[in-house]
Amino acid sequence: MDRSKRNSIAGFPPRVERLEEFEGGGGGEGNVSQVGRVWPSSYRALISAFSRLTRLDDFTCEKIGSGFFSEVFKVRHRASGQVMALKMNTLSSNRANMLKEVQLMNRLSHPNILRFMGVCVHQGQLHALTEYINSGNLEQLLDSNLHLPWTVRVKLAYDIAVGLSYLHFKGIFHRDLTSKNCLIKRDENGYSAVVADFGLAEKIPDVSMGSEKLAVVGSPFWMAPEVLRDEPYNEKADVFSYGIILCEIIARIQADPDYLPRTENFGLDYDAFQHMVGDCPPDFLQLTFNCCNMDPKLRPSFVEIGKTLEEILSRLQEEEQERDRKLQPTARGLLEKAPGVKRLSSLDDKIPHKSPCPRRTIWLSRSQSDIFSRKPPRTVSVLDPYYRPRDGAARTPKVNPFSARQDLMGGKIKFFDLPSKSVISLVFDLDAPGPGTMPLADWQEPLAPPIRRWRSLPGSPEFLHQEACPFVGREESLSDGPPPRLSSLKYRVKEIPPFRASALPAAQAHEAMDCSILQEENGFGSRPQGTSPCPAGASEEMEVEERPAGSTPATFSTSGIGLQTQGKQDG
């Protein structure tokens, strides 16, 4: 079979082998009908993504995971040996979302956004090739027995916030932000997080323009309350999902309400959750509570989240360095007194550290920094107008609001919808990354762009949010030395400058393009996922006082070991 036919799919153009074929040149009879043709922008966007088209049999595949709509393989190119990840769509009704995801990823370039590598066609379907992330996802990392100090946890939270801030600045929000879609990369500098899975991403609606209400999509455990109630929502829904992820990071528990306490109105049970935080930095816990606020207007933006986490991370690193300086003389004295201490043999390293049925380890012990210095008390306030603490003497069992609604099926489903024309239009309007951002591999054939012979009328400016990301393009390091600064020029993000305390950049106008696309009929499908049981974490003794309606918010005081409820109101 001819290769051009083998690499084509219904509704999509075959791979262009020569520039003359795209432009209608070459002098062949088959190109006569193409002379002078004005190609629509949707076709040109696909050509850009298809410039790195490959076949499945060009790779060796190893399955490493699966989701509701796709299976993920670790693939190695037979010729070059390059390792990538292949996301194979398994649901025919999800083809439109897969196509949109490919087009969107092809126009995003940021160290905390999963990097697009190319596309693969197999059995008439389009599949995305991305960079391979070597340490799984955030949910798997938190479920492991690895000890994660607070500096590492805050750094991972910072990476996710920076990636989402970049996405929001581009005028798009994720709508399916979960700990499963945050991938973990490990290198010589430690752990870093990368945001993935943009199949449900949508253009941020403009309330002033009377935008159409968006459909209910996402994973229920992480969905914002306004989304679950089928109310109008915007990018602040991503902030609530991020808050649930922060709860997972702090307590190292699953987002399942059987482990993470929730309220009947799909909010976070702050009073119950504070028993599970151990020696969490109070300002980190305060940020988590702010993100989980039931009122979308009271949730911070990812710009504010990133700045707060940057301050927290800097303080934790200073405390860690101070603790190391105090530990060095003590460790030296112990070695002088006990020179005969012998290290365990290498055979002990081979003993498995986990039982056949692993159970989640929740790190609730005091940090070593508490041994040397007593931290001053700090307060954590709950400013959620829809939250009422329960009376400690009449506590009710844990609430699972997802079991009360039949349509949510216990929360173990995933809602999806066809992409709207607005997000497709925005995808085509986004500037593609520069050629230096994603170098082609040896097996990838570069495709020269066609000569522009047409001009569209000027369009209205793109609806980018003005709260730009001053820290986008930076990547913190867990090493002892100063973190490297990655400027926006390196990642070809023209709209976002590197971190400065200057004013925010204004949105840039983009050229209007034809946004027509064929849409298939959508079906509703779900694939329940099994959940592994984990023990509830040890909680600390607390006294909880109920606040009457209309009173000031409850205030929780912390002094380095657990949290205690103050008997007086703020102010």
Curated annotation (Swiss-Prot):
The main location class comes to nucleus
Task: Give the UniProt keywords, A-Z.
Answer: ATP-binding, Kinase, Magnesium, Manganese, Metal-binding, Nucleotide-binding, Nucleus, Phosphoprotein, Serine/threonine-protein kinase, Transferase, Tyrosine-protein kinase
Polar residues bias (residue ranges) = 552-571
* Residues reported to bind ATP: 64-72, 87
> What PROSITE patterns does this protein map onto?
PROTEIN_KINASE_ATP, PROTEIN_KINASE_DOM, PROTEIN_KINASE_TYR
The UniProt-reported impact of residue 11 to A is: In a breast infiltrating ductal carcinoma sample; somatic mutation
Activity modulation: Activated by autophosphorylation on Ser-219.
Record localization:
Nucleus
Query: What GO annotations for molecular function exist for this entry?
Result: ATP binding; metal ion binding; protein kinase activity; protein serine kinase activity; protein serine/threonine kinase activity; protein serine/threonine/tyrosine kinase activity; protein tyrosine kinase activity
Report the enzyme's class at the first EC level.
transferase
What are the EC numbers?
2.7.12.1
Tissue expression summary:
Predominantly expressed in testis and prostate. Found predominantly in non-germinal Sertoli cells.
Q: Name one Pfam family in it.
A: PK_Tyr_Ser-Thr
Region called Disordered, residue ranges: 521-571
Which residue positions does Phosphoserine occur at?
Answer: 219, 369, 456, 460
* Catalysis: reaction(s): L-seryl-[protein] + ATP = O-phospho-L-seryl-[protein] + ADP + H(+); L-threonyl-[protein] + ATP = O-phospho-L-threonyl-[protein] + ADP + H(+); L-tyrosyl-[protein] + ATP = O-phospho-L-tyrosyl-[protein] + ADP + H(+)
Name the protein family. Belongs to the protein kinase superfamily. TKL Ser/Thr protein kinase family.
Protein name listed in UniProt:
Dual specificity testis-specific protein kinase 2
- The gene name reads TESK2
